[in-house]
């Protein structure tokens, strides 16, 4: 529920089992809640707002002002949600519920131990947010991804850009030869 206080604090991007999180939880966790308030200006709302997650282990449900922004499954892949329509000028609440039952054999657990003490690995279990999270404000149209492909034989580089939104785009091609 929006505005509900949580029982503790955690340093993100460290999982609650990590000493650096300030929690250092040693038992199994089925899931963990995160909540943060952010202030957004009218000017920032003129474009798009994209909420990025470096990684959350394993299933993340993301809420903005009590509304579901999206869900993501997978503990190692980055993901993002366009939260523009869910934000308002002023204070906004972002909440994340991360679910990761390491004892469920249907959920990939990597090298995490199913036993209380680590067995077969030298690190703690990982539940929840364990990579950086950031809220990015962009124009309505923006380049979300750029990739470069090189061909050593031909000496060519191909660049592809992924554009989000509608905009007039001019493509320019340059050729540079080295002898």
Model-assigned labels for residue ranges:
Residues 18-20, 114:
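Short Pro/Gly-enriched beta-strand edge/turn motifs at strand-loop
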Residues 25, 29-142, 166:
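Accessory beta-strand-rich segments of carbohydrate-active enzymes
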Residues 12-18:
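Solvent-exposed edge beta-strands and adjacent loop segments
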Residues 1-9:
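Predominantly extracellular/luminal regions of secreted and cell-surface proteins
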Residues 9-11, 37-39, 80-82, 91, ...:
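Ser/Thr- (and often Asn-) enriched beta-sheet segments in non-cytosolic proteins
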Residues 60-62, 171-174:
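Short beta-strand elements bearing conserved aromatic residues within extracellular beta-rich modules
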Residues 139-166:
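Surface beta-strand/loop "capping" patches
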Residues 175-179:
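Conserved small/polar residues in nucleotide/adenosyl-binding loops
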